[in-house]
Amino acid sequence: FIMAFIFACSLCVTNSSCNDKKMDGADSLASDSTLVDTTAADSTDEIIAETPMPKAADELFDDFIFNFAANKKLQMKRICFPLPVYKNGKLTKEIEKGKWKMEHFFMRQGYYTLIFDNKAQIKLVKDTTISHVVVEKIFFKIKTVQQFVFDRKNGEWMLTAIEYKPIFRNMNASFLKFYEKFSRDSLFQINSMAEEVKFTTPDPDDDFSSITGNMMPEQWPDFKPGLIPTGTLYNIIYGQKYSESTRKVFMVRGIANGLEIEMVFRRRSGKWLLTEFSC
């Protein structure tokens, strides 16, 4: 199956704020953050496992990873066993096929997150020529990033390695340190805003239109996106090159549930500030 995203959010308050659907990630080294009944999820997995992945799903990495994360049979076929596991660049072990545990990534939480240096990099999501992608699982509590390395071999995406690195060595380290506090501290959110923040939200009177304006920091509780992920985050590196930039685009994308949130942060005088957002 191929997932599709719909650029829309529902409204929850009368002053055109974003929706208030709350979904928090769990901070654990478990293979997934299970936010649904596991029995029902296992039954769904069995059904999906019997559904072959369309060949076209290897064209776009997003289409592949959704299938890979939901289809156990496919996942086992698309891993290069024994799978090497590295820590700080050194090989620590190799996982044999019989020892592998199903990795659902972000599928059961209903959304995933992306980090870009600029909006132009977002186009890489639809690039069918890329052959190397890294899915990052970011654990704030233990200050570690788990990287799943995928390479396209003979036209098929394969998981070729897993790497563990400390957050401080990540190319987004400065932003991640800031975002970890921003995501869980409402007062810090207000204090981490530009004097005016540009926003775009759905028009409550027209399902096909949006409203764009500016808000003051003290208005944030009424206008903020309904979901600001915390706990364990994900990031997909499609080939975007990160730098010590003064701008980060943080995106939240729903999995077949219509959710899409975009927040733009800029670093001014060493301090990250939210400058615009849309949902």
Language model: regions and residue ranges:
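C-terminal motif of bacterial Sec signal peptides marking the signal peptidase cleavage site
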Residues: 13-17
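Surface-exposed beta-loop interaction hotspot
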Residues: 154-192, 199-210
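Short, aromatic-enriched amphipathic alpha-helices that serve as compact interaction elements
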Residues: 56-73, 172-188
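Surface-exposed, charged secondary-structure patches
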Residues: 85-142, 203, 209-259
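Bacterial signal peptide processing site
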Residues: 19-21
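N-terminal low-complexity, Pro/Thr/Ser-rich intrinsically disordered segments
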Residues: 31-66
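Short beta-strand edge/turn micro-motifs at domain boundaries
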Residues: 136, 140-170, 258-279
